[in-house]
Regions:
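Conserved alpha/beta-domain cores
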Residues: 2-201
Length: 201
């Protein structure tokens, strides 16, 4: 067996593995939705590609992953350029510095961590220059942890009221990172806060 054949076999096995993993995750989502009385079609699976090579992402695309999330803008930008021949929809899920908005505006389809009017203004300006618009989620710090980005819950309503002025930002909803804890009640509390905030908007 030559090296090229070995690489092809490895890629085929990776494709099978990714398809199997996707099926397992989707089944877990279906089971959880059934238990909660929720429609599985209302849940969106977004694979996060942090530290994963572009070659493996190409295989993941073949397995059915057509949307991918990245938390670092530089890594996302590099991957989007290498994989420009594939119509991947890129979601930036991490904190964005104002000076990096120009990069996001060139390729991303979605930004899930908006928590600053300064960033909103810069991103809107850059998107207008590119002739593009993207979907945006407002990040909320529902756990109150200082190590996390996001707006405090009490600031969300006022923040959202300022967003219609940014015509290139399509506000789709809220995003949070719940507290990382084995205490399910503490985790659930974060999502209850989010539901309450959503009800006020």
């Amino acid at each position: 067996m030559n090296q090229e054949t070995a690489v092809e076999l490895n890629a085929e096995q990776q494709l099978i593995d990714i398809k199997n993993n996707l099926a397992t995750v989707k089944q877990r989502i279906n089971d959880a939705c059934k238990k909660a009385g929720r429609d599985p079609a209302s849940v969106r699976l977004l694979p996060v590609t942090k530290t994963v090579s572009a070659e493996r992402l190409r295989i993941a695309y073949a397995a059915g992953c057509h949307e991918m999330g990245e938390n670092k803008i530089q890594e996302a930008r590099e991957k989007s350029e290498v994989l420009a021949d594939l119509p991947i929809k890129w979601a930036i899920i991490g904190h964005l510095q104002t000076n990096k908005a120009k990069y996001l505006a060139r390729f991303a389809n979605e930004f899930q961590a908006l928590d600053s009017l300064k960033v909103a203004e810069e991103l809107d300006k850059r998107l207008q220059n590119e002739g593009r618009a993207i979907d945006v989620f407002v990040q909320v710090n529902s756990s109150g942890e200082e190590s996390k980005f996001g707006l405090p819950p009490e600031a969300v309503r006022d923040f959202v009221q300022h967003l219609p002025q940014f015509s290139s930002l399509r506000i789709k909803g809220l995003m949070t990172l719940a507290i990382f804890s084995s205490d399910h009640d503490r985790v659930r509390e974060c999502f209850v806060k989010m539901r309450n905030i959503q009800a006020m908007l």
